[in-house]
Regions:
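Metal-dependent nuclease catalytic regions and adjoining charged, substrate-binding loops involved
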Residues: 27, 152-156, 164-183
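A structural signal for short, well-ordered beta-strand segments and their strand-loop junctions
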Residues: 126, 131-134, 173-178
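A short beta-strand motif that forms part of the nucleic acid-binding face
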Residues: 136-138, 180-181
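Alpha-helix capping at helix-to-loop junctions
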Residues: 102-105, 137, 167-174
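Metal-dependent nuclease catalytic cores that hydrolyze phosphodiester bonds in DNA/RNA
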Residues: 1-131, 138-156
Length: 183
């Protein structure tokens, strides 16, 4: 299958309940359940990680922000509703990947650990061989992915993040799979 039909394939599968032959339905469902349990477990028991380390997920952040983190300055504590928003994003990512599999697309390299010159990260996956970063976004953020303006207005560093994963994998075949979290 090709990634250019991915969204339509998911919608078709949801609408018709027809899952392509060969898709291990029960395995996908069981894996989804286990992954959701782990996400919740991590979010309610996870201890703080060392923010002084540069990671793929923060290489696109502003230099000043990275400097403060690296030098141990504490920023504002995240509010509980913000933590829940991040949890929601992780759950959406897992759901989207399960739907991708159920629609018959090949999802590999999930959470593969990569490294470029000592900077480590966990790429989301490859879908049909394409390095893919899965995101949930507000309608405003979603529009940036859809119209391509993210390349010039990227407050979260997503472009640099995916470039880092691409460099580690030796590929230029990359993309985002983004869900508008309000629709």
């Amino acid at each position: 299958m090709a990634t250019d039909t991915l969204v339509d394939d998911i919608y078709r599968m949801i609408d018709t309940k027809e899952i392509p032959d060969g898709v291990p339905i029960e395995q996908v469902i069981n894996d989804f359940g286990e992954n959701v349990k782990q996400i919740l477990r991590n979010n309610i028991t996870e201890s703080k990680f060392d923010k002084r380390k540069l990671r793929m997920s923060n290489i696109g952040k502003k230099d000043r922000q990275l400097w403060y983190s690296y030098n141990g300055y504490k920023g504002e504590e995240l509010m509980p509703h913000t933590r829940i928003k991040f949890l929601y994003g992780h759950l959406i990512e897992e759901m989207v990947l399960a739907l991708t599999k159920l629609a018959g697309h090949d999802v590999t390299h999930e959470q593969k650990q990569v490294e470029v010159q000592g900077i480590k990260g966990s790429m989301d996956c490859k879908i049909d061989g394409v390095l893919t970063d899965v995101k949930s976004a507000s309608p405003y953020g979603f529009k940036k992915f859809k119209d391509g303006s993210l390349i010039n207005d990227d407050p979260f560093g997503y472009v640099d993040q995916i470039k880092g994963y691409a460099h580690a994998e030796g590929t230029t075949d990359v993309g985002w799979l983004v869900m508008d979290k309000t629709n």
